[in-house]
Amino acid sequence: NVLVSMGADGALLLAETGRVYRARLRSAQPVVSTVGAGDSVTAGFLAGLLDTEDYALALRLGTACGSATAYSACLASRDMIEAVLPAVEITTL
């Protein structure tokens, strides 16, 4: 798997299955700090993949984690991540 975090432009995932997924936010909030946002994308994606074995759901969670972290001064809380999740849109390319 190859996961590319693209900041405000979302993320791309090339899954080992050969499918390509794109994550975007339908609405965004002001960025407070990008420190740790990429790491949060990776951690959220891995947690989601281990939990569900579903690439689209894992990418959605990873994108929400990274975005929520960027919207805060420190790492995002679970509540913050859950608030961002509905705004994450996944498409298959």
What are these language model-derived features?
Residues 1-93:
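Conserved phosphate-binding/catalytic region of the ribokinase-like
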